[in-house]
Amino acid sequence: MEKSWFNLLFSKGELEYRGELSKAMDRFAPIEKTTISKDRFIYDMDQNFYAWGERSSYYNNVDLLVSSKDIRNFISDETFFVRDSNKNRYSIYFDRKKKKFEINNDLSDLEFFFYSYCSSSYLNNRSKSDNDPHYDPYIKDTKYKCNNHINSCIDSYFRSHICINSNFLSNSNNSNESYIYNFICSESGKIRESKNDKIRTNRHRSNLMSSKNLDITKNNNQLWIQCDNCYGLMYKKAEMNVCEDCGHYLKMTSSERIELLIDPGTWNPMDEDMVSADPIKFHSKEEPYKNRINSFQKKTGLTDAVQTGTGQLNGIPVALGVMDFQFMGGSMGSVVGEKITRLIEYATNQRLPLILVCSSGGARMQEGSLSLMQMAKISSVLCDYQSSKKLFYISILTSPTTGGVTASFGMLGDIIIAEPYAYIAFAGKRVIEQTLKKAVPEGSQAAESLLRKGLLDAIVPRNTLKGVVSELCQLHAFFPLNKNSLK
């Protein structure tokens, strides 16, 4: 008999075989495991997970979820110790050969669900069919029936007993369901899908790649966006550049992130006229540095790779800097460093909370050592802001955040938040592999891996990011100017 511990979470959709969400504030018990297949499950033996919450509401963090369609693959003479959202523990014992299903005495009503299904006419009268997509010629029909209805009774029980009703951090009444169901990811940061799902996705992809749909995307690129993972079309503003089909996080421009975080009509930009003057006269055979700067300025409408300014976040005055990867890969040159430095100095003088949203490929090589100097310059003013003035700095890492930004202000936040699936590293995967002649483990530079190693404080989806940052500011005594503006 094998025994396994796992945290149980259930939303109003089908249980998904995915991985973990994130950590936040309230301590949740660790996950333990004795023996189970490594290929079937994702687990972490040493990790404590956390959850955002208020007095009567909470979010669970999940290290292990099992799909209902995969249940027949693991219910062979195993006892599972289950911990529900209220931290109550109980056991479920399956014996597929003897068709036994046992629950401890505290959950006798779950047994009632199971035996009700087993005695139903549907179970007794169901016949085998070659057209049944679930039919497996190598598994006896009786075993399939037993497994199917074990899953059904568990499904019914948890639907009726486990619910999460908090509307914290979101304006939507269904925020928790979407938070839990849509943002559960695997350890590698990619959504797992079954063989049938892949076939369906490929067919769907071929349809979406038709000339008609591509024309729609080109003609309405301000309204619609195409996922670069599954090629599905989505309404840009409503979905926050997150694919509703596969959960893939697409890049956002700095203007889109400002719109996401800052209250309408409160944004006041700073140093918009600051432009790089090619300080080291960088020579390039392909394209002069000045010409390249001009082309990106026309393409993005920005003067350089960062926007800085002040505004209100749910009524709270903040100083905000947002890097834009579309401008030369978000590289940090003298202008980027100077604008961020001036923003921090302004926040220090005005005693404002500081938020920096990072998305960068690192220091800008066209400016040589001047770009590297920005790392020390920004870190120096941050030291005064944090250590001397005791003010609050939140660093938000998006994909990708690498190089000099990671090595300086990106990882200096009092609170370091990352988006799901974000690629965060100092040296890129290709550079490491070429230097060390060793393969970099898949997912080792993903936000989820860094969270487990303690390099991040939380992984927060876009739809809850504004609420999380607002709550953090209030915890550090930064309150809205108008209490009615707090949502």
From Swiss-Prot:
GO terms for molecular function: acetyl-CoA carboxylase activity; ATP binding; carboxyl- or carbamoyltransferase activity; zinc ion binding. It comes from the Eukaryota. It catalyses: N(6)-carboxybiotinyl-L-lysyl-[protein] + acetyl-CoA = N(6)-biotinyl-L-lysyl-[protein] + malonyl-CoA. It holds the Pfam family Carboxyl_trans. Gene3D superfamilies: 2-enoyl-CoA Hydratase, Chain A, domain 1 (3.90.226.10). It is an enzyme of class 2 (transferase). Binds 1 zinc ion per subunit. Its main location: plastid. Its cofactor is Zn(2+). GO terms for cellular component: acetyl-CoA carboxylase complex; chloroplast stroma. Zn(2+) binds at C227, C230, C243, C246. The keyword Metal-binding applies. It is found in: Plastid, Chloroplast stroma. Belongs to the AccD/PCCB family. Acetyl-CoA carboxylase is a heterohexamer composed of biotin carboxyl carrier protein, biotin carboxylase and 2 subunits each of ACCase subunit alpha and ACCase plastid-coded subunit beta (accD). Component of the acetyl coenzyme A carboxylase (ACC) complex. Biotin carboxylase (BC) catalyzes the carboxylation of biotin on its carrier protein (BCCP) and then the CO(2) group is transferred by the transcarboxylase to acetyl-CoA to form malonyl-CoA. This is Acetyl-coenzyme A carboxylase carboxyl transferase subunit beta, chloroplastic.
